[in-house]
UniProtKB/Swiss-Prot annotation:
Pfam families assigned to the protein according to its UniProt record, in alphabetical order: Ank_2 (PF12796)
Biased composition (Basic and acidic residues): 292-305
PANTHER family associated with the record: ANKYRIN REPEAT DOMAIN-CONTAINING PROTEIN SOWAHD, SOSONDOWAH, ISOFORM G
S-S bridge residues: none
Protein name, as recorded: Ankyrin repeat domain-containing protein SOWAHD
Organism lineage: Eukaryota, Metazoa, Chordata, Craniata, Vertebrata
Gene label: Sowahd
Signal peptide (from-to): none
Domain of life: Eukaryota
Organism: Mus musculus
Biased composition (Low complexity): 260-275
TM region(s), chain numbering: none
SUPFAM superfamilies, per database record: Ankyrin repeat
């Protein structure tokens, strides 16, 4: 009986472990419907967070090209099958291989230069003609390669530095190789080699460009000026005509030159006359000089007359009183 009571009402047993402080537990969601919505929201948040991390990592990849980042964006947007209109294909998205025909072609919008192109631009700016010829023998397509900053080709630099002989040699090289040779190609600001030659005052370069190489003197730069507008003021009329001056401009310059010559002659004549007048004595000066001469000559005449009279008196005394000669 006692055993049955003990089994029916068991007494709590003392525990040897210390009482643990109960930590606040998460709120228990008893509603099954709320629990389902909570799980769905948690899954969505984790998916959005992972996509956001992937998106930011795709945008901040160091050293990745724009084509690769665009491909990753396409994958995130689920556009692997078809590219939107205006996007390049996967072949065009690949970076150009150094030394390939596509990477070294003319008219490229790249800013990064190959070592050979960089060396060519430096040699052209310094007018090292022997180095330029060696590089042209190895790669003739560098002849009309322009500096991406100034827009100058080797023709611009040679014209700027007054190298007319080198211009003729380059023209002969291009003609032998059948290469394009545009002596009127515009550079930065629309300046042609003829503009630069006029700016620097290289008369022989102007004559070679127009007379021998067939440069167009009527080309205008971005300011609307022809090469003749950059000539020095004392340039000859023949040089102005070679540089693209029109007939009315040549006539105006001729009249201006004649007027300057006439004014210079008049000034020279006036200066000579004034100097001659300064050297020639005036009438008043002559009269005053004559009066002073008379005044100065009177004492001399009086001295001469007195000395003559004194001599005559001595002779008369000697004649009348000869005994006084020895005294």
């Amino acid at each position: 009986m006692a055993q049955a009571l003990e089994d029916g009402n068991p007494l709590p047993k003392a525990s040897n472990r210390p009482a643990e402080s109960e930590a606040p537990s998460d709120p228990q969601i008893k509603d099954n419907h709320c629990l389902g919505r909570y799980k769905v929201q948690a899954v969505r948040d984790s998916a959005n967070l992972s996509q956001e991390r992937i998106f930011h990592s795709a945008l901040t990849v160091s050293g990745a090209s724009w084509a690769r980042r665009r491909g990753e964006l396409r994958e995130l947007l689920g556009l692997q099958g078809a590219a939107p209109a205006g996007w390049l294909s996967e072949e065009h998205l690949e970076p150009a291989v150094p030394g390939s025909r596509r990477s070294s072609g003319q008219g490229s919008s790249r800013v990064c230069l190959e070592p050979r192109e960089h060396a060519w631009i430096l040699a052209a700016a310094e007018c090292r003609f022997e180095v330029l010829l060696e590089m042209l023998e190895a790669e003739p397509s560098l002849l009309m390669r322009e500096d991406p900053i100034t827009g100058y080709s080797v023709l611009h630099w040679l014209a700027k530095h007054g190298r007319h002989e080198e211009l003729i040699l380059l023209h002969d090289f291009a003609r032998r190789r059948g290469l394009p040779f545009d002596v009127s190609a515009p550079g930065s600001g629309g300046l042609t080699p003829l503009h630069l030659a006029a700016l620097q005052g290289h008369d022989m370069v102007i004559k070679v460009l127009v007379g021998a190489l067939g440069a167009d003197p009527s080309r205008r730069d971005h300011s609307g000026n022809r090469p003749c507008h950059y000539l020095r003021p004392d340039a000859s009329l023949n040089l102005r005509e070679l540089s693209g001056a029109e007939e009315w401009e040549i006539e105006r310059d001729r009249k201006r030159e004649n007027a300057n010559n006439n004014s210079s002659r008049t000034t020279t004549t006036t200066t000579t006359t004034s100097r001659w007048l300064k050297r020639t004595p005036s009438a008043s000066c002559i009269k005053s000089t004559g009066v002073h001469y008379k005044e100065a000559s009177q004492p001399v005449k009086e001295k001469k007359a007195s000395s003559t009279q004194e001599g005559q008196g001595r002779c008369l005394r000697r004649y009348l009183f000869p005994f006084t000669q020895n005294r």
